Amino acid sequence: MRDLLLGTTIPSYFSWLGLFPRFLVWFGFLKASFFCSSRNQSAGESGRRLKMKRAREDVHTDTQKRKPEVSSRGETNKLPRTIDALTYLKAVKDIFHDNKEKYESFLELMKEFKAQTIDTNGVIERIKVLFKGYRDLLLGFNTFLPKGYKITLLPEEEKPKIRVDFKDAIGFVTKIKTRFGDDEHAYKRFLDILNLYRKEKKSISEVYEEVTMLFKGHEDLLMEFVNFLPNCPESAPSTKNAVPRHKGTATTAMHSDKKRKQRCKLEDYSGHSDQREDGDENLVTCSADSPVGEGQPGYFRDYENREDTETDTADRTEKSAASGSQDIGNHKSTTKYVGTPINELDLSECTQCTPSYRLLPKDYAVEIPSYRNTLGKKTLNDHLVSVTSGSEDYSFSHMRKNQYEESLFRCEDDRYEMDMLLGSVSSAIKQVEILLEKMNNNTISVDSTICIEKHLSAMNLRCIERLYGDNGLDVMDLLKKNMHSALPVILTRLKQKQEEWARCHSDFQKVWAEVYAKNHHKSLDHRSFYFKQQDSKNLSTKCLVAEVKDISEKKHQEDLLQAIAVRVMPLFTPDLEFNYCDTQIHEDLYLLIKYYCEEICATEQSDKVMKLWITFLEPIFGILSRSQDNLALEDVSKLKNNRELQDACLAVKETASGSNRKHPISPKRLSKDNTKMQGSSSREDVSANIKVKTAQPDKLQDDAAMTNEVIQSSKFVSPKNDQIMEDEGNHMVNAASVEKHELEEGELSPTASREQSNFEVNGQNAFKPLQKVTDNVRSNKDKQSCDKKGAKNKTRAEDDKQENCHKLSENNKTASEMLVSGTKVSCHEENNRVMNCNGRGSVAGEMANGNQGEDGSFAFSERFLQTVKPVAKHLSWPLQASETCSQNDSQVFYGNDSYYVLFRLHQMLYERIQTAKKHSEKKWKAADNTTPDSYPRFMDALYNLLDGSIDNTKFEDECRAIFGAQSYVLFTLDKLVQKFVKHLHSVASDETDTKLLQLHAYENYRKPGKFFDLVYHENACALLHEANIYRIRYSSEGTRLSIQLMNSGNNQLEVMGVAMEPAFADYLQNKCLKSVNDEENHGLFLNRNKKKFTSLDESRGMPVAMERLNIINEMECRMACSSSKVKYVANTSDLLYRSKQGKPNSRVSEILKQRRISRFHIMLNCRLCALPL
């Protein structure tokens, strides 16, 4: 309640302030007395009830019998009695004795009023909330209120109406239709009354009177109808059959009409009288024609809350019920949608008609809008809703990626603003000129008042205002007051500004073009920033080792010892695999590393790095060593008289060197290195296993490229068809030089003769026997001379082998006997054997002279052979020759973390250079490309970056200009090369790494059939102890490098016994591996296939039946020796399929087609002839 509404004046209010604080003092005294005394000090339960009764009687007396005293309190200035305050406070405490918080809240309220932090209206409002539901306390508090203030209880608060909901309204309408089923006029009249009320043509009183007359004799319907009325007047005329109203609806009709009009203003359903035909008649028709349970629910409202804020929901529900658009059955399921707006519905499960629209739920009450004619009903949409696809909480600013794109955006903003300025000033000039022309032609009277807004638009006026800056408003006033004088001056000023802005626009065009040129390519690159940050971390040793460990733990879950137990070749599953498909990149890497070492590193460091590269990395990847390259080039130079060969050499030279590449070669060494480039140009095809047949006359005069490929192969093997083929190892074995008496496999430390028999040297002199063969291939002599020299070489090789076999017979024990007996070879014997091997200076001595270095760490000499003796001298593993895992087309190396990181850095460098080369080739093959190959241009920029000629920014710009936004992986090449060279030097200087190199060289001295992977692994384990061991294998057949961590659980090859239990061995041989005789073989299941070959015997029918049949046996199983249970290995299976037969060519198809046509005609003629005439 407010002061103005209650008529309380300010003087009376302040006069009452002098009385009410006394009541607060009494409250304070009573509070202290009540809280100091315990509850046991009260007079007992019976006394408390008597006092409570007395208090209620006093309150009732004060509120009803003593009302004149309250109204005259202000005049007589009579104070409330002390006993009244005491009784009221006691009553409050007794009522809330179980709810101390409310009592405390009441006392705090009194304190706040005493401190003047709350006014009388605030006290009344809070008392009504605090004592809600306690009618006696609310009315009793009026005793202490000043004049003009009173707490009144509304009729609704005395007795609330019965709560009704949507289902009750539906049931009521259904009951009416059922009750008046025989009297259709009564039901239609009821609907008409509701529609008239909806159109504000009848008040609540009138509706009640008419419904009372309509429901005469149906008192139950009238009583139920009263519950749906908002405020039914107590004075409404009633008949003797009318149901008497309760006190809760004692509200005047005028008040009800006002509230109804207020609700109608919020949502007007119908504003014209002709809507009765569209709305009410439809309602009546649908209700009359529908059966019980499917009719219309009629008019209903939710009258639980009658606040104005809820009228929207009530009106929407009312309209849906009276519109006739849904039946009662549907309305029963719409209760969950009552009051729910469309934007809060969950439409994810609704039918999607288009990407933007969905159908409303079938049980949702659809509102029928007003002012809709027949055409609107046919065309307008009521059931499709646009789905929310975004949110306004997020800004619409573009997600900018980098600073270069920001520059482009700023440039675009400047251009847009400049264009808008020029456009606006041009438009203003045009309109001003038109206006002046009209004034000069007297089209517009000069004496009359001219409205400037009719001739100039708002944009033109704004342009003029901005033209004068701070004085723009004054100019606009002058323009309106004296247009004839101001317009010419403004026009001149506009033209001057237009010329000035045009010059600025022309000058800025150059600046904008420069900004675009500098930032366009950089703006497209949004990954380089993050790549640079992550690349330094990815190149670290810790990150690389952690990567392979994670892969190894996830990939290798099976135990390899199961396969070893059944004497099967261990299944090595690499953790990492990399492809080296382009061998020409190895030459580019060599030149790159060499150039960097010469420019940056010291001479000693450069020599160590390049020696490790030449003697270790290149042989691993099957690249011909530099010394062998020189020998091959000498042979090529002998064939210069061949014109065709000279042309081929020139082409190879141009291909390898490149036209635009910056060569890291001094002028003094230019001719020498150019010759090397010729020899190395054909290395791209080394790993492709190119074979040159020496027995065919037409291949005797091959070109220099093919001849050079044969010479550069790092390992030659002579197969049965007398072909010279390339391999990855460093051994050369002739077909005629195979020994007749081989050593026992697995011997780790042979004598001098056996050492020489098992090992072949990889030096320069090792190429001398092959040199004669290659000379014969390259010469122009006939086939006979080639055959004679080949026979001569074979005879010489056989003599050497006979001598070796004679010496082999003098050995005391074979290698297998040593392994089984466990006899250890003493170091003294080992040294003697190595010395005996060194005594054969015809091989090892010449090799040492050819490859001995300054420090001797990588030289293949006698002293080197003494340091690479086998570390593990005894193995309890009876290895067989068939168990060797080294093949002629692969190289195996066991190393530690340093070598693993070395190969990973090499692979990363190779991959990035390969990426540049692929992008260059792709760009060069484009149809619209007119520029030459961009790869030499890129390499030249990289060399300039390494020697400091350009900085990183220019190098990045050059890469973007060449390859585009995909070139971000090339930005850190200088960091990668620097880290790679530093790591190469670290490996070359480390003692453990050097021993691993020596062990690898020792194992590679074995013949191809004498190399044992397990022996090599055991020696590496003995050397590295607990450190990580990596198996690094390069296969030239597939040009793939595989890396496997050998220390992770199941991958470790531990020595174990392989003895098989006799019972299990008998079961395996007799049951599982027993071959089935022909007599025991049962018939085939597919008999139709057998009939095709019944005319053939087994020997001739089997090849025909197996034609185009492919069988892949990959099913693996494991058998327990104790229980003989078989367990199949997951992800393994056998496969049998027959490949499709090749389609015949068009000529054969045509012949077959003609044959079929002819056979058809013959058959048709026979049938026609057989027909009776």
Swiss-Prot record:
**PROSITE patterns reported in the protein's UniProt record:** PAH
What are the cysteine partners in each disulfide bond?
none
Name the residue ranges with Polar residues bias.
320-337, 750-765
Task: List the subcellular locations.
Answer: Nucleus
The GO molecular function terms of this record are: transcription corepressor activity
Question: What InterPro entries does this protein map onto?
Answer: HDAC_interact_dom, PAH, PAH_sf, Sin3-like, Sin3_C
Entry keyword set: Nucleus, Repeat, Repressor, Transcription, Transcription regulation
Pfam family name, one: PAH
Coarsely, its chief localization is nucleus
GO cellular component terms attached to this protein's record: nucleus
Using the record's annotation, list all stretches that form the PAH domain: 79-148, 162-232
| Disordered: annotated segments | 40-75, 236-337, 655-697, 740-813
Q: Where is the composition biased (Basic and acidic residues)?
A: 55-75, 264-276, 301-319, 778-810
Q: What is the purpose of this protein?
A: Acts as a transcriptional repressor. Plays roles in regulating gene expression and genome stability.
Protein name as it appears in the record: Paired amphipathic helix protein Sin3-like 6
